[in-house]
């Protein structure tokens, strides 16, 4: 039985129209379909509008400035009349029961304001995962029968993040557009804004696979700079713990420096290490800021 909650799905996308098209085929296979789908493409060519008529739910194309936070904000502005806004990355493959589990979670737990799912595989930490492998992984997984599938988390993982819209609407909450382009840690900042209004949880029954597609992402130098600038900015802003920010910086810089000797083919480690160095240099000069990546290549 439906709870009466109205769910919208939102995807901000850039440079991956074929991936998005296949992701939408998976979304159309949900056992519980969304009331609406909002897509914010960075460019007109990033979404094939002809696909909209083939999908079993209303499709709305919204316009926003290029960059994940800005595009997601455009989606929020368009979806404020819904109860739950489900953010997916354009390369996230949800299990067929995903949205049904989202509805169950938010209907049963009024204190939950953000829920993220359990990743069965994440291509970000490797060369990437294709759709066939993602489907096979999902098909072979048995959902846990535990009565308490929720675990409290500091933040959700932005590739699959369900948000209760009421506190967002009531308090004018938005993603921070000072974190440009790919965003990087924008999910942490947004979740910590919401944390004062309720629980942030991981739900073991909301499952999916993040393909980790490499195309359409930020350059290594820019990404490396963001690995320094964004944690520092969020620490100064007060939406991340200083210890957590420091551990994140140390871990990322260490990985980039050590692995730049024999880098993985799918990661520009040397570019990232150079971006890290630029970030530290700007910190010493007193001009470290996330938006500086717009001046880098």
Kindly label every feature range from the protein language model.
Residues 182, 199-221, 230-234:
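Active-site donor/metal-binding and catalytic loop motifs
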Residues 156-163, 167-172, 177-206:
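A short, conserved alpha-helix in the catalytic core of glycosyltransferases
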Residues 69-84:
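Active-site nucleotide-sugar/metal-binding loop of Leloir-type enzymes
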Residues 117, 134-154:
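Short, flexible, basic/aromatic active-site loop/helix in glycosyltransferases
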Residues 97-130:
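Conserved donor NDP-sugar-binding/catalytic core segment of glycosyltransferases
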